[in-house]
Structure formats: structure tokens, C-alpha cells
Swiss-Prot record:
GO terms for cellular component: cytosol. Belongs to the thymidylate kinase family. Its EC number is 2.7.4.9. One of its GO terms (biological process) is dTTP biosynthetic process. Keywords: ATP-binding, Kinase, Nucleotide biosynthesis, Nucleotide-binding, Transferase. It comes from Rickettsia peacockii (strain Rustic). Phosphorylation of dTMP to form dTDP in both de novo and salvage pathways of dTTP synthesis. This is Thymidylate kinase. The lineage of its organism: Bacteria, Pseudomonadati, Pseudomonadota, Alphaproteobacteria, Rickettsiales. ATP binds at G14, G15, E16, G17, I18, G19, K20, S21. Signal peptide: none annotated. CDD domains: TMPK (cd01672). Coiled coil: none annotated. It is an enzyme of class 2 (transferase). GO terms for molecular function: ATP binding; dTMP kinase activity.
């Protein structure tokens, strides 16, 4: 915990179709039931301005650097207007996606992209990283079947299995690089409730 924060910052990460949003919502509802001050938000988005940027990011084909800067601009607004104030008030903040998604979705398209994204984040938002990140580990073949069954149509949903595998192995690499922060929850064969119970054990 750094001196910018009084609360706790929890993020959920992984590819498409893995249940991040479901788990974020379940944890939010659980903490509410415990009378814990908590907010639930998401990226890209979370504020009026950032949600408008999201529409461009998920539907338009941007140049790789433009896409990265769009994501970072949205995050800066989100952090300044919502996440940091909530943490300073002592809330737990649960965020569906954060910096690790930017690394895997935008950084891989750029030379030295992983370090570039983390360094840019540190420049814009020094010392502010999640306290704990849950990587929901679902095999790409399972994830793409889930996405196809729900008929989603943003540009990331409709990319093929090679894209899903690239994203998956990127998150695996990050979980190995930052094992103290990123907790891997193997979820391919588990129900949402079983995944939720595993997550609670890390709190």
C-alpha cells in the first residue's frame, strides 16, 4: 500500500469469455453484504469521458500506438475522477480490467511493448498499482466457445483463436513475472461460485 491510498485496489484480468465481469460483480456483492465500503468499476471506461473513449477503442481499428494512447487517456480520467478519490476515502475498489489488459491487448502490438506500457503507466500515475490482481485462467478453446455463444461483436470478441491464445499466454507471462500481485485462478472446469470461493480465500 502506498501513501496515495487508504483503501484497497483489486483488479480482475484475463482474455475474453473467462468470467471476469461475473467474478467482479460477485465479489462486489459479497463485500457489500459484509458492510464493506466498496465500488465496482471497469476499464476501458468507468467515467463518462472514459466510456466514450471505450466506444472508439472497442469498435474502431486504430493504429497500435493510437490504441495504446487512447487506453491510457481513458485510464488517466478514470483514475483521477473515480479510483483515486474512492481509495482515499477508504473504499475497496474492484476494477474489471486494468493495466495488465493494456499490456496484453495494446502493448504486444508495439516494440518492447510490455515495458513501454508499464513505464507509461508509472509516468502518468506514479506508484499506483493494484494491491491484488486475479487472473482468471480459462483455456483459449473454452473462452472462444463462450464468446461465440453470447453473440458479442466488439473487435476483440470476433478475433480468432490465435488472438485468444496470444492474449492468454501474455497474461500467463505477467502472472509469472509478478507472482506477489497476480493470483492465478484456474477456472476452466469450475462453476462461477467455485471460482468466487477461491477468490475469497486470497482476501
Amino acid at each position: 500500500m502506498n501513501n496515495l491510498k487508504q483503501g484497497k485496489f483489486i483488479t480482475f484480468e484475463g482474455g475474453e469469455g473467462i468470467g471476469k465481469s461475473t467474478q467482479s460483480q460477485m465479489l462486489y456483492e459479497y463485500l457489500q453484504s459484509q458492510n464493506t465500503p466498496v465500488i465496482l468499476t471497469r476499464e476501458v471506461g468507468g467515467t463518462i469521458v472514459a466510456e466514450k473513449m471505450r466506444e472508439i477503442l472497442v469498435h474502431e481499428e486504430l493504429l497500435p500506438m493510437s490504441e495504446l494512447l487512447q487506453a491510457m487517456a481513458a485510464r488517466y480520467d478514470h483514475m483521477a475522477r473515480k479510483i483515486i478519490p474512492a481509495l482515499q476515502e477508504g473504499h475497496i475498489v474492484i476494477c474489471d480490467r486494468f493495466i495488465d489488459s493494456t499490456v496484453c491487448y495494446q502493448g504486444l502490438e508495439l516494440e518492447n511493448g510490455i515495458d513501454l506500457v508499464y513505464n507509461l503507466h508509472k509516468t502518468l500515475m506514479p506508484s499506483l498499482m493494484p494491491d491484488i490482481t486475479f487472473f482468471i485462467d480459462v483455456e483459449p478453446d473454452t473462452a472462444i466457445k463462450r464468446v461465440n455463444s453470447r453473440n458479442m461483436n466488439n473487435k476483440f470478441d470476433i478475433r480468432g483463436i490465435d488472438f485468444y491464445k496470444t492474449i492468454y499466454y501474455c497474461f500467463k507471462e505477467l502472472s509469472n513475472r509478478f507472482p506477489e500481485r497476480i493470483k492465478t485462478i484456474k477456472a476452466s472446469d469450475l462453476s462461477p461460485l467455485e471460482v468466487h470461493e477461491l477468490i475469497k480465500k486470497h482476501l
